[in-house]
Amino acid sequence: MNTSVIRVVVVSGSLRAPSRTHGLLQALVEKLQARLSNLDVHWVRIAELCSALSGSLERDTASADLQLHLQAIEQADLLLVGSPVYRASYTGLFKHLFDLVDHQSLRGVPVVLAATGGSERHALMIDHQLRPLFAFFQAHTLPYGLYASVEAFDQHHLVEPAQFERIERVLDTVSAFFQIPVASAA
């Protein structure tokens, strides 16, 4: 088994904290950590960066804290990204964050796409909005996305068993990407 550290960057695109988007990503990270012990996990929470992002029209005007998050994204071995669905798309500050990321830095990086919304009708946002964004970066978007509607949560905690099954399927593709034997924690 590969024992080198895998730098995982988790981007939670919600403007609120706590949020269902964060809850979905947290469940994903916990299941990933149950499978692999060689992870270095870095969280980028848009809710904590609203002021820094709105005050940074260009990369060179970004605060030191925002620069650290941008560098973490650019150096990631694996990205886990999620956003709530607003008006059939991801949040504006989520997009603005990636506007500041070097356009060549994510080439070939595997990305797990996730979204949350009020109903199942928003599930296509993953394929119609998130996947094209990361295609621009020439990132490797993994085939299974994670979408969870409000019914999958108790407050901000993921509770729906079918969602945990989807997470395991996603993690199987992550394991295959890194050529790690699949040993499901389910």
Curated annotation (Swiss-Prot):
The keyword Phosphoprotein does not apply. Involved in the dimethyl sulfide degradation pathway. Catalyzes the NADH-dependent reduction of FMN. It catalyses: FMNH2 + NAD(+) = FMN + NADH + 2 H(+). This is NADH-dependent FMN reductase SfnF. The lineage of its organism: Bacteria, Pseudomonadati, Pseudomonadota, Gammaproteobacteria, Pseudomonadales. One of its GO terms (molecular function) is oxidoreductase activity, acting on NAD(P)H, quinone or similar compound as acceptor. Induction: Transcriptionally activated by SfnR. Keywords: Flavoprotein, FMN, NAD, Oxidoreductase. It is an enzyme of class 1 (oxidoreductase). Its EC number is 1.5.1.42. Belongs to the SsuE family.
